[in-house]
Design a protein with these regions (language model features):
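Hydrophobic/aromatic beta-strand elements that line small-molecule binding cavities or substrate pockets
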Residues: 77-82, 115-121, 134-135
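Terminal "cap-and-tail" regions of soluble proteins that handle hydrophobic small molecules
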Residues: 2-19, 126-208
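Charge-dense, low-complexity intrinsically disordered segments
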Residues: 8, 12, 50, 107
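Conserved catalytic-core segments centered on acid/base and nucleophilic motifs
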Residues: 27-28, 40, 118-121
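Short, aromatic-enriched amphipathic alpha-helices that serve as compact interaction elements
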Residues: 14-30
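A solvent-exposed, acidic/Ser-Thr-rich amphipathic alpha-helical stretch
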Residues: 34-99, 198
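Short, glycine/acidic-rich beta->alpha junctions
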Residues: 17, 74, 110-113
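Exposed beta-sheet edge and beta->alpha loop/turn motif
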Residues: 88-124, 138-160
């Protein structure tokens, strides 16, 4: 039996509930269903992404403000893998964050490829999210109209990490402070540190 195969009906039900919890949280973010999104997080959860670090409820408040400012992120999600350990679990999936942007006067879509890692915990019989982290892989910028070109010089992005360089560049232009020490494939040791933290919290070995 593999580490991710459920051993009984209870584990299968837990995995299904966690999967639906994550999908509900991301759908609520995309569709501005803010109270539903808020209900997905435990109050003492920890969220660490490019533009935000804090608890889940405050993350929702920040997302509301981001949407109000005209930065409506949408998410493309791959299948979710849940690793269960009693009342705790880690879920991972590949995700692409799409942001409609205007840069240098040209409308485009900024797409950031990441691996999302969620921590979930069951309390009083219900699962809630305890954490959300992203491992940044790469990003890309696609103008809305074929043939248009957005020119960004190396000098403009020299202070930003390669794995989320364009995202950092855009968020910085919108007044956001971006953490330059987040987990990313361009600095493998940052990924190793995150995996040790999350899998240690869950009490299960890191996959090999």
């Amino acid at each position: 039996m593999s580490e991710t195969s459920p051993n009984n009906l209870t584990e299968s039900a837990d995995i299904t509930e966690i999967t639906q919890l994550i999908l509900r949280e991301r759908e609520s973010r995309d569709l501005a269903r803010w109270e539903t999104m808020r209900e997905c997080f435990w109050p003492d959860s920890l969220i660490r992404v490019s533009w935000f670090r804090g608890n889940g409820p405050d993350f929702v408040t920040g997302s509301i403000e981001m949407a109000r400012r005209g930065i409506p992120a949408k998410h493309r999600l791959a299948p979710i893998l849940v690793r269960l350990a009693g009342d705790r679990a880690i879920a991972s999936l590949h995700g692409i964050i799409d942001l409609p942007v205007v840069l240098k006067g040209i409308r485009a879509t900024l797409s950031t490829h990441s691996r999302f890692l969620y921590r979930a915990e069951k309390r009083e019989g219900a699962w809630g999210l305890m954490g959300f982290d992203a491992i940044y892989m790469r990003d890309e910028l696609t103008p809305d109209l074929p043939g248009q070109v957005i020119t960004i010089s190396p000098e403009e992005t020299k202070d930003f990490r390669r794995s989320y360089r364009l995202l950092s560049y855009y968020l910085h232009s919108q007044g956001y402070k971006v953490d330059s020490n987040l987990p990313g494939e361009d600095v493998p040791e940052t990924v190793d540190v995150l995996y040790r933290e999350l899998f240690g919290w869950c009490g299960i070995p890191i996959p090999k």
